[in-house]
Structure formats: C-alpha cells, structure tokens
C-alpha cells in the first residue's frame, strides 16, 4: 500500500489511519527511512507496511 503525502499530513495521523494506532508512527518512519518525521514533503510517496510487517517489528 502507498500514501501520497499532502499538506497537513503527519506520520502519527497516518499511523492511526493505516495501522490503527498513532503511537506506531515510528514503524512508518523506519519502513521509509524517514529521519525527520516533522518534515514530510507534499507529493512524497510513502510505503505503508502490511499488518504482518508491523507485527514482526513489534515482536522484534
């Protein structure tokens, strides 16, 4: 799954929308090599991890 960043998008809001929990924002950052999550650029295409990938990251 992919998401094209628009003005006003925040990683925590995207995590809530796609992963069900805002506090999983770091998984989207890790999956997309984002080092400065407050600096999302409109037009950037983010990869959204699958539920399986998210679970694997949570379990270590």
Where are the predicted features?
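Cell-surface/extracellular proteins and modules involved
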Residues: 1-60
């Amino acid at each position: 799954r992919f998401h094209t960043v628009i003005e006003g998008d925040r990683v925590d809001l995207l995590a809530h929308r796609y992963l069900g929990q805002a506090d999983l924002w770091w998984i989207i950052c890790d999956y997309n090599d984002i080092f400065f999550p407050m600096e999302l650029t409109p037009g950037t295409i983010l990869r959204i991890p699958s539920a399986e990938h998210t679970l694997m990251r949570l379990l270590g």
